[in-house]
Amino acid sequence: MDTVTVLNELRAQFLRVCPEKDQMKRIIKPYIPVDEFNTEQCLDSSIRELYMNSDGVSLLPELESPPVSKDFMENYASLGKMRIMRENEGQKGKANQNLIGAEKTERDEEETRNLQDKSAKNTLIVEENGTLRYNPLNSSASNSLLNDDDHTSGKHHKTSSKEDSYLNSSMEMQKKSSKRSSLPFVRIFKSRRDHSNTSGNKNVMNTTNTRAKSSTLHPPGARHNKKGSKFDMNFDFDENLEEEDDDDDDDEEGDDIHSQFFQLDDDFDAKGSGASPAHKGINGMSNNKNNTYTNNRNSISILDDRESSNGNIGSASRLKSHFPTSQKGKIFLTDNKNDGQKSDSLNANKGIHGDGSSASGNGSVSRDGLTETESNNISDMESYINEKDLDDLNFDTVTSNINKTVSDLGGHESTNDGTAVMNRDSKDSRSNSNEFNAQNRDRITPGSSYGKSLLGSEYSEERYSNNDSSTMESGEMSLDSDMQTNTIPSHSIPMSMQKYGIYHGDDDSTLNNVFDKAVLTMNSSRHPKERRDTVISGKEPTSLTSSNRKFSVSSNLTSTRSPLLRGHGRTSSTASSEHMKAPKVSDSVLHRARKSTLTLKQDHSQPSVPSSVHKSSKEGNILIEKTTDYLVSKPKASQLSNMFNKKKKRTNTNSVDVLEYFSFVCGDKVPNYESMGLEIYIQASKKYKRNSFTTKVRKSSTIFEVIGFALFLYSTEKKPDNFEEDGLTVEDISNPNNFSLKIVDEDGEPFEDNFGKLDRKSTIQSISDSEVVLCKVDDAEKSQNEIETPLPFETGGGLMDASTLDANSSHDTTDGTINQLSFYKPIIGNEDDIDKTNGSKIIDVTVYLYPNVNPKFNYTTISVLVTSHINDILVKYCKMKNMDPNEYALKVLGKNYILDLNDTVLRLDGINKVELISKKDARELHLEKMKPDLKKPVLPTIQSNDLTPLTLEPLNSYLKADAGGAVAAIPENTKVTSKAKKISTKYKLGLAKQHSSSSVASGSVSTAGGLANGNGFFKNKNSSKSSLHGTLQFHNINRSQSTMEHTPDTPNGVGDNFQDLFTGAYHKYKVWRRQQMSFINKHERTLAIDGDYIYIVPPEGRIHWHDNVKTKSLHISQVVLVKKSKRVPEHFKIFVRREGQDDIKRYYFEAVSGQECTEIVTRLQNLLSAYRMNHK
């Protein structure tokens, strides 16, 4: 479907749905081929059907607007130019009347009005029936009139100077007015300058004779004679309303700015109107009958324009070389269709007249029609162009039109002949060119304002001052310097690589890549063969001479060269004409210029360009160098080597440094209630035998650890000045087993014999006295101490293996506690192992690599602290293997669960075996992350006496399992099919079904998978009572690994067996009693559950001496209600009925956390339900 049909469909659709008839009538009718009849019968049948309504009635008669004119838009710019020219000439003439005498104005008034009548007759656009149409009769008449003027001027060269000056002034005013013709909305590009009055006065003074003749072209009232059609494309926009408020000089300066912004040539527009003073003064043998002569002159105006000023090299056009061709330029090229001989004769005539220029004697006017002030006031924005504004222009057919024009210019003569003719012109003009350059060198700005003002280009004066090194004359100019296809740059990147450079900052690597890629893309889009066809003479003209002009013409000719020469490249001409053999720049000069212009790129570590690339620019070679000098990563040290070196360093250090191991005994960094002060004497020391030193130690530390810490202080902080003479040697104090700790007698001496000697494995808080003394032991007692408390380190400094410690004393247990199994596996060994490691709290975690095909060999052991997180295991393993920990995760061995890296090592529940799996594989296997463990309490209670982050000190509650334990092998694939719903109280207590070992073996409950061998360590749940005798049944192994979903309503007690409810299990919690009327609304208390009794007691060791707090004892039968608050998860209440009374006592408590509050309420409710069932 073509565009015409689509547009008519839109018009017809609007006609049908338009609610306003007046607005509907203003829709423009479709194009009617025959304008005289103006009837719908001339329309195409398909288009006529679109304007039929549902009743079959045509909508076209209702339209009041005239039909679309075919040639209206093509000639609309000319109409706007003629209109603006008449208005502005009258306005400028009014401004110039103040500087010119009244006598001269009256003398020229009659001649001016005659010229106005002539220009009115030459109007190319006429209005007929409300439609603007092109009039070919007036066009031919205009051309014949112009040719007659040329013929007359050719015959009479000695006419009066007044008449010649008048012709020049009229063309100058047309130049000024034609600058407005590029845009109908002239106020869009209006610009104000503070110095507009000054520059305007200078321009008036420089062109006094010119402006004087044209001051009365139009009277002042001519500005208001605007005649527009009913449906004008300006949308009734009146320039006069805007311009009346501005000064006259401001308008004059604004006209120059419009032309400077778009880089339009004055002569180019003037010749488009059919009048040029250069041709009037040069061509005396023109043909005034043929219209093609004018068209030929317009099409070759790019070449003619070069010789319009003193024969200087190239005043080709003020179109910037990177500025795309305008619509008018395309019309001039496409109109040229025949009569190429007259083009050649035109060149010959101009060659005869040599420098033929009607303004050769004017020293204050520059070569392209600008005064000196106007040349200095060129806008800095002249090299910019908005790409979106030119999207509607079509540049696809310019290449073919250029080729056609070049072929038409050649005519019946060969290209070489045409070149020879133009070369003769160049010879005649070379001498005048040097003279002109010498006069105007100071006021001509080298290069383009794009490189000067916007990029701060560093140009060399040597490049522009050497006129003798010119290797390119006007005859070798190419048409495609101005008429060029595909020249719209992307985001204003200049297409020419000659005068423009991209200047770099400190870090422009990304910018370089983007610009280089853009330049390569634009250069590769051109075809060199097509470009060589458009060149008249000379394939690669250089920029050494064309750079003397304000507006470069040949800058676009070098765009086919390598982009590595961006901004400063030079080439040598390959023309074969005789005059091209003029003295050229030597190779050394070219090399020096190249070096100076490419210095900036080399400073930024860009690949240097060899000279061969500069010389072979025709071939378009591109040098691309790949950077391969990447930073080589240093090899990381081997883990095994680090272990050996560490061992070596530890061996060479002082043996006293190993006592630093006992520094953890210091009680300065723990709360006061967890530490105690000691006054320590040293019997064998001269300084501390009578004078003790004071320190603070942890209450939970053993006597052996206190001995080691005292020796550490003696060797560091409390070290005497004369250590060698004090009585102890380094070998003595390096081993704590050489000493024992005793209580001091009243006279300051230790008790004799074994009285007062403290047990090495008991805690320091068991003694009631704070004064102790270190005494040396004999060899027999030292040997006994070595067996009882072996050193956790070697004398050389290395830590001993845990298996060595276990082998030393695993054959015997010293606490005499019973061997007992429980539901929970501890994360470290039994209490003997704990005492032997002296609180090191380090466990080994085995990490397997997924898939675990060979578990006997494919594993790595990582040692971490009990308080560390699972993320620490992953980080240590990845650091050891030089892997990225962000790409891996840890999963439970044999389970489809991903461990949460924020959980502690306690989540492993003693099964210290994990698998390393990549996150990609985990996503493919759809592994789920383990849910938070809400069942186990995380705060210190009697029940939760395992090692948690807040309870780091284990009690005597870890026993070894019997060889024939009651733990049966349970398959790992057994799962609980029932999901955790709202479990009833009976099911919580386990009363509905009693579990047995057989049911456990059959898979009624889930297991952790790691207790199948029955040789693990288990937690003794009843650590305060000895009421549990015999073998316990196995219940709910590894609840954290269970597949049951737990909610806050199903805490730790859910799913447990209820035997602890009847066997005197003891639980203790820290709570706060809330009293609203008290001065302090919260008081700390300890809530203890012991069998059937509930105790509310004051906190241990943290009550003030003047507080009188009673201990309240409640039986479970007195409890009326135990309920958790719904609004605050930490709050709960207990209602109790007092004995012998009917009133109810209410207790409101606040637990440490919501989980512990749920645990307390659940235990009390279970205990209350069990008591009521047994006492029905």
From Swiss-Prot:
Which residue intervals make up region (Disordered)? 87-233, 267-378, 405-490, 524-618
In-chain residues carrying the UniProt-annotated modification Phosphothreonine: 510
Location of Phosphoserine modifications: 140, 144, 400, 509, 552
Provide the positions where the record notes the PTM N-acetylmethionine: 1
| Modifications after synthesis and translation | Autophosphorylated by TORC2.
Annotated membrane-spanning segments are none
Task: Give the Gene3D superfamilies listed for this entry.
Answer: Pleckstrin-homology domain (PH domain)/Phosphotyrosine-binding domain (PTB)
Q: Domain CRIM spans what residues?
A: 638-786
- Which Pfam families does the record match to this protein? CRIM, SIN1_PH, UBL_AVO1
Q: Where in the cell is it found?
A: Cell membrane; Vacuole membrane
Q: How does it sit in the membrane?
A: Peripheral membrane protein
Which domain of life does the UniProt lineage start with?
A: Eukaryota
Instruction: List keywords of the entry alphabetically.
Output: Acetylation, Cell membrane, Membrane, Phosphoprotein, Vacuole
Q: GO annotations under biological process?
A: establishment or maintenance of actin cytoskeleton polarity; regulation of cell growth; TOR signaling; TORC2 signaling
Q: Name one GO molecular function term.
A: molecular adaptor activity
Q: Where is the SIN1-type PH domain?
A: 1065-1169
Q: What is its main location?
A: membrane
Q: Which InterPro entries match?
A: CRIM_dom, PH-like_dom_sf, Sin1/Avo1, Sin1_PH_dom, UBL_AVO1/Sin1
Q: Which family does it belong to?
A: Belongs to the SIN1 family.
Further comment: Present with 704 molecules/cell in log phase SD medium.
- Assembly, per entry: The target of rapamycin complex 2 (TORC2) is composed of at least AVO1, AVO2, BIT61, LST8, TOR2 and TSC11. TORC2 forms a homodimer. Contrary to TORC1, TORC2 does not bind to and is not sensitive to FKBP-rapamycin. AVO1 is required for TORC2 integrity by tethering AVO2 and TSC11 to the complex.
- Name by which UniProt lists this protein: Target of rapamycin complex 2 subunit AVO1
